[in-house]
């Protein structure tokens, strides 16, 4: 079972489906494409049994290193200014980590999943502004947020390799980025994703507890 992301597709217009060609426009996307192609080739040869589950950017308890982890949830939990990549006004699919785990377990238990790529179910895509609003509601106070621009990431990338990598993937956050998991739902569903409001509240609680331990 290979847990993958959506980097392989590159910039696309419309929802992301499994039948899109691999047209990665970035180094990270090209690496992911090569890994997936090699795994599927090994499956066809009978060397391995492989199924690939792809999710969008993730969040949830334990997700500090996510692109919306420490810089968004962590900062908000500590009362600091949070950062959102790209535009705040375009919809973006985000997968909740426990839902990703459930879906991967499902794929691992079903022989018909083998040899295929599957998109893992996520709750409805939200704009950055709406997502930050859910964090604020869970915290019970406003959250100050800055939309991080391409220019800002390029400047920061002179000193910070992580900022350079974020700049490379920023196209996902500058236009609608919508995951289509209907293939998974037709084959194995219904698997109902956790509603964002509930998932965000659980994630905020985890980051709050973590911040408390950090400052002890």
What role is predicted for each listed range?
Residues 71-93, 144-177:
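Alpha-helical membrane-targeting segments
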Residues 45, 49-52, 56-91:
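NAD(P)-dependent short-chain dehydrogenase/reductase
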Residues 14, 18-21, 25-37, 66-70, ...:
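Short-chain dehydrogenase/reductase
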Residues 35-49:
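A structural motif corresponding to the C-terminal end of an alpha-helix
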Residues 8, 58-60, 100:
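Conserved sequence/active-site signature of Rossmann-fold short-chain dehydrogenase/reductase
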Residues 64-71, 85-108, 115-117:
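Substrate-positioning beta->alpha
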Residues 103-165, 181, 186, 194-216:
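Mid/C-terminal beta-alpha module of Rossmann-like enzyme folds, strongest
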Residues 1-31, 43, 51:
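Conserved Rossmann-fold NAD(P)-dependent oxidoreductase catalytic core, especially the SDR/UDP-sugar
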